[in-house]
Every structure is written in C-alpha cells, then in structure tokens.
Amino acid sequence: MQCGLVGKIIKRFEQKGFRLVAMKFLPASEEHLKQHYIDLKDRPFFPGLVKYMNSGPVVAMVWEGLNVVKTGRVMLGETNPADSKPGTIRGDFCIQVGRNIIHGSDSVKSAEKEISLRFKPEELVDYKSCAHDWVYE
C-alpha cells in the first residue's frame, strides 16, 4: 500500500480479464497476520514477516475468473523478486523477498480460507462485467 502501486496492480488483473468482486483497505493486525500465515509460523522469517506486514495498511482484494489462482500466481512472479521475470508484479516492483508487496493464494482451497478471514459472503459482489463476452467464450 505504501508504494502507491494499488492502481497498477488492479489494472494488470483487469486487463487480463479478471473481475474484482471485493476490496478493502484496512490495517493488518498481528492477530490476523498470524492466522493468515499460520502455515509459516515455524519458519525463521515469520516474526519479520508479521512485523513488516503489520507496519501499515493493506488492500485486500478478491478476484474471479477462469483459472484466476493459477494465472494470478504467474502474474505475481516468484516469491523471491530476484527470481521473478520482468513483466511480473514482483519482477517489476519488488527487490527483496522480505519486502514483498503482494500476496496471492497458492490454491483454490487457500483462497477460500483467506477470503473468509477478511470478507463476509455478502461482501462479495456478483455482477457481469461489460468485458465478459469479449474475454470468455
């Protein structure tokens, strides 16, 4: 959030043909971060991750579309920005792995869990984008 890249990130997902169905701008509490990243709790970098993520607000988004989790991960690039290709979000906007600017769910199951931590079902907006028929068969 602090880097002023939210609009550029949204633009990339919209240009790909994905549909934004929910978004929130909010603080990332330590409690929430520990729950969100519970699978990493035993890793040596975990305390630093929580401290960094808790240092400012976050923008949580929910995107829908064909293979959005898989394709979204490709668009993000590798977790380590040094391994990310130019043209990916991390390849273009990140330098150090400990200062990653974006998170993407690694599976549909993880996405469902992570979405439920931030959004109520009624906060997900169901609509048909005017670009839908140009993107999908």
UniProtKB/Swiss-Prot annotation:
Cited SMART domains: NDK (SM00562)
Active site: residue positions: H103
Gene3D superfamilies cross-referenced by the UniProt entry: Nucleoside diphosphate kinase-like domain (3.30.70.141)
EC number(s) on file: 2.7.4.6
Cofactors, names only: Mg(2+)
Keyword annotations from UniProtKB, A to Z: ATP-binding, Kinase, Magnesium, Metal-binding, Nucleotide metabolism, Nucleotide-binding, Transferase
Any single GO CC term annotated in Swiss-Prot or TrEMBL for this entry: nucleus
One GO MF term attached to the UniProt entry: ATP binding
Top-level taxonomic group: Eukaryota
Binding site for ATP: F45, R73, T79, R90, N100
Cystine residue pairs: none
GO annotation terms (biological process): CTP biosynthetic process; GTP biosynthetic process; regulation of apoptotic process; UTP biosynthetic process
Protein task: Major role in the synthesis of nucleoside triphosphates other than ATP. The ATP gamma phosphate is transferred to the NDP beta phosphate via a ping-pong mechanism, using a phosphorylated active-site intermediate.
Family classification: Belongs to the NDK family.
Protein name: Putative nucleoside diphosphate kinase
Organism whose genome encodes this protein: Homo sapiens
